[in-house]
Regions:
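A short helix-to-beta-strand connector/capping loop
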Residues: 5, 50-53, 142
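His/Asp/Glu-enriched, well-ordered alpha-helical/loop segment
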Residues: 37-129
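Short, small/polar residue-rich loop motifs at catalytic or cofactor-binding pockets
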Residues: 106-107, 139-141
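Short, Lys/Arg- and Gly-enriched loop/turn segments at beta-strand edges
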Residues: 130-135
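Short aromatic-centered micro-motifs
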Residues: 146
Length: 153
């Protein structure tokens, strides 16, 4: 039904891995965490199977230490999607969803495309992230150029 109606689903992958909040084994919270990670697998699997419009989302940007892990978190989506689908989700697909915010949209131009008049922030990556998605895990090493608002960093 979500896919038929064009509903967007913004998910954050909660996995039982190095980025998970460490909880005491056997505790009630640990049991809930295990259920949540199983639910993450189910949610992404169903989204992919039914072609639901899926956006990349995270709340780690508010913590400077966790923010450095965003690329690694994004790369983990290859558990359900191809590297090309992951990169498209984080760029063009998210831009498509953000464009739906109408008058609350703070961006005066198009997002997620490289064309005249668009707000095209760019990353130049050392290597091919479609062949090796792990390149986006280490921006200090692999991002050779970061362009934001036309300014190169």
């Amino acid at each position: 039904m979500m896919a038929e109606k064009g509903v967007w689903w913004s998910l954050q992958p909660f996995l039982d891995d190095e980025d998970a909040i460490p909880l005491r084994e056997g505790s009630a919270n640990r049991k809930k965490q295990i259920q949540m990670t199983a639910g993450t697998d189910t949610a992404y699997g169903l989204a992919k199977q039914h072609k639901v419009k899926t956006a990349w989302g995270t709340d780690t940007l508010f913590d400077p230490k966790l923010a450095t892990r965003q690329g690694a978190q994004l790369a983990k989506l290859v558990r359900w999607y191809s590297p090309a689908e992951v990169l498209k989700m984080a760029t063009a697909d998210n831009a498509e969803m953000l464009a739906l915010s109408g008058p609350r949209n703070p961006y005066p131009g198009k997002l997620g495309v490289v064309e005249q008049g668009a707000l095209a922030d760019l990353l130049l990556v050392e290597g091919d992230p479609i062949a090796n998605i792990k390149l986006i895990e280490d921006p200090e090493k692999n991002f050779k150029v970061i362009m934001k608002d036309g300014k190169i960093y």
